[in-house]
Structure formats: C-alpha cells, structure tokens
Amino acid sequence: MVLSIRSQIIIGVVSSIPLTSTILAIAYILMWFNGHMTLTLTLTTIITSCLTLLICSIFINPLIQKIKQFNIKTKQFANGNYASNDKTFNSPKEIYELNQSFNKMASEITQQMNQIKSEQQEKTELIQNLAHDLKTPLASIISYSEGLRDGIITKDHEIKESYDILIKQANRLSTLFDDMTHIITLNTGKTYPPELIQLDQLLVSILQPYEQRIKHENRTLEVNFCNEIDAFYQYRTPLERILTNLLDNALKFSNVGSRIDINISENEDQDTIDIAISDEGIGIIPELQERIFERTFRVENSRNTKTGGSGLGLYIANELAQQNNAKISVSSDIDVGTTMTVTLHKLDITS
C-alpha cells in the first residue's frame, strides 16, 4: 500500500502522541514528575501535536496540489502530449528545481521528436522522389528494348539512336543508385585518411571522364590557377565526389555550347584553397540559394525530367564538405549563371 504525503504526516504526528504519553507515564512512575505536572505535560503534548498537524496541513496542502499538477503534467507528456507547458512552480525550492529539470528534459525531447518527424517526412519525400525518378528511365529502357526486340525500330539511324537512349538511361539509373548509396553512407560516421593532393593532377582525373561529353555538347571548359599551389593534405575521396557533383550540376543546368570555368586560388596565409566552378546556366533566385543544399529540394519548380538525376548531388556535396573540413558557397544571377565555390582547409597532419 502506497501512502500519500498527507497520510504519512498525519500518521507521524498522531503516533507521536501515544509515544510522548508513554514517556510521560514512565516519568510519573519513576516519580520524575508529580501527577499534576504529568497531566499538564500530556495535555500540552496533545494540543501541540494538534496544532502541529493543523500548521502542517496549511503548508502541505499547496505542496500536494503542486505535486498533483506536476503529476498530471508528466502523465500528459508520457501520453505523447509534447505541447509546451509554461506552468511554473516557484516554491518550494525542491519542486521548483524539479520542474525546471523536467521542463528542460521535455524541451530537449520535444526538439528530438520534432527532428525525428522532420527527418521521417524528408525520407518519405526522398523515397517518393527517387521512385518517381526511377520510373522515367526504366519506362524508356523498357519501351526502346521492346521496340528493338519486336522489330518496330528497323532503320539504322533509329537503331543507333535507340542504343544511345538506352545507354543514356542506363547511366542515369547508375547515377540514381550511386546517389542513393551515398545518402545511406553519409551519416554512418565513415572516415577517410588524409592524402597528399596535387591539385592539377586531381582535376585531370576528375575531368577526363567528361571529355567526350564536353566535346559532344560543343562546350568550352577552362581551368585557371590564379597562383601556384603546392601539394597539400586533404581527404581525396570526398573531395573528388564534391567536385564531381558540382561539375555535374553546372553541366545539368546550363545549355549545350555554353562555357564552364574552374578557377583555383589560394588565400594569402596559404591555409585555404578556393575552387570555383562557374556556368552560364539558368541561375538561382536569391531566396532559393539557401535551400539548394536541402535533401528534398530541387531548383526546378516542377520535377523536370530533362535535367535527369535525383536532385541529391548538391545535398551530398554539401554534407561531405561539412564532414571533411570544407565549405561550399554559392553566388548566382538569373539567366546569367551560377558559381559554386568549395573552400578547402589544408590539413595539418603533424598536429
């Protein structure tokens, strides 16, 4: 049986009366007190105990009410009612401190729950977007494959065009799966060893796979080193992915025949390097420039399939940058172009 605070106080005070009376009776037997004095002390004890009980009730009732209110508050929170409760208990000190600790805990849990809900919503949108993106290349592959199989596509130039489309859509699927893999591994805590990087050699290895595409689309791509940059230590694998995604984005949102510029500079104290990739594309309005690195955001107002991809490239690049001692900034003008700048901090492997 669990007793309330009020019951425990009443039992304690009432129990003190017979205990005190017994002690006084023993004192009378031992002739420490005479009969009149013993009776007086006994009555005084009873009256004092009653007054003590009354005074305790006066002080304890508000405390019990606060504890009941606090209990209701905790039950509501336990039942999933995470709405903020601004009720404050200013006294006694222990209840005040307990309430403050509970409010702090409730606030942190509420923030975590809101974050979980937000992440779940983002994941749902991400899955829906990826499912949408997968349907288009798959439908195209199925359609052209059936056309080739059934003999509907017979002319040589149509057959060649069909194969080109099949390869393009297969590459698009590969990119989608690659993005999905990177999304899964982004928050696993995977680390990369620092490597000595010669920037010109790194750029050659990154740009080489784009050579045929740039030539086929009649584009101009120029790389400009503003000053001589010595080899430095950085995380090669994330850096390659960041630059690849930014270059993909520049090609995706600029027209065939346009220009891509890559400008590399080192700051005066030689501890950071800026790699700026500029295009002559559609541009991004100022109010959207802060959102382009969100996981579920795409620059297109509608999900325009002509750009391809999953729309995750910038999100992946930004996450990798934040995790690996780098930063991405953006400047853009509508119908003029966009510049994405990666700021790398050289790693000091001796520290």
Curated annotation (Swiss-Prot):
It is a multi-pass membrane protein. It catalyses: ATP + protein L-histidine = ADP + protein N-phospho-L-histidine. Keywords: ATP-binding, Cell membrane, Kinase, Membrane, Nucleotide-binding, Phosphoprotein, Transferase, Transmembrane, Transmembrane helix, Two-component regulatory system, Virulence. Its main location: membrane. The chain crosses the membrane at residues 9-29, 40-60. It is found in: Cell membrane. GO terms for biological process: cellular response to phosphate starvation. One of its GO terms (molecular function) is phosphorelay sensor kinase activity. One of its GO terms (cellular component) is plasma membrane. Its EC number is 2.7.13.3. The modification Phosphohistidine is found at residue 132. Autophosphorylated. Residues 129-348 form the Histidine kinase domain. Residues 61-114 form the HAMP domain. SUPFAM superfamilies: ATPase domain of HSP90 chaperone/DNA topoisomerase II/histidine kinase, Homodimeric domain of signal transducing histidine kinase. Coiled coil: none annotated. Member of the two-component regulatory system SaeR/SaeS involved in the regulation of staphylococcal virulence factors in a strain-dependent fashion. Probably functions as a membrane-associated protein kinase that upon sensing the appropriate signal, autophosphorylates and in turn activates the cytosolic response regulator SaeR. SaeR/SaeS activates the expression of exoproteins involved in adhesion and invasion of host cells, including hemolysins (hla, hlb, hlgC), coa, DNase, spa and cell wall-associated proteins (emp, eap, fnbA, fnbB, efb). This is Histidine protein kinase SaeS. The lineage of its organism: Bacteria, Bacillati, Bacillota, Bacilli, Bacillales.
